């Protein structure tokens, strides 16, 4: 059986990257929440 996680840097960035988060209102909310929490890394 093949593994379900087949990593791809491009897909990772496109789905979870900073620019993708900034492109939607809810994504910006996610970043704001992570800043408020004091996360060192905001996005993938």
Curated annotation (Swiss-Prot):
InterPro entries: Ribosomal_bL34, Ribosomal_bL34_CS. This is Large ribosomal subunit protein bL34. It comes from the Bacteria. GO terms for cellular component: ribonucleoprotein complex; ribosome. Residues 1-44 are annotated as: Disordered. Keywords: Ribonucleoprotein, Ribosomal protein. It holds the Pfam family Ribosomal_L34. It comes from Streptococcus mutans serotype c (strain ATCC 700610 / UA159). NCBIfam families: rpmH_bact (TIGR01030). One of its GO terms (biological process) is translation.
